[in-house]
């Protein structure tokens, strides 16, 4: 049975107007699980960027990759305007996809 591919560009944020991470994947649900469970070390886990604030689905991976590159070249202000246009409260859209809400961010020193 062939694996279903759903090319997607997504933006994760550490919080409202926080650090942003832009990625591309063929399986958004799997990739979100990896980010949220620390299964992939790197920028997103280092900066605790787990909240899905924007995503766009594509018919093919080539278009998704082109869009990812475009967004990565945008100024931060443009990215914020894109998010605010569709998700002004910066809600975690992953909750609407079936993920549990993330615990509120605390300080790293435990206080």
Language model features with spans:
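GIY-YIG nuclease catalytic motif and its immediate N-terminal context
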Residues: 1-41, 45-51, 55, 62-69, ...
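A short, polar/charged loop-to-alpha-helix boundary motif
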Residues: 77-83
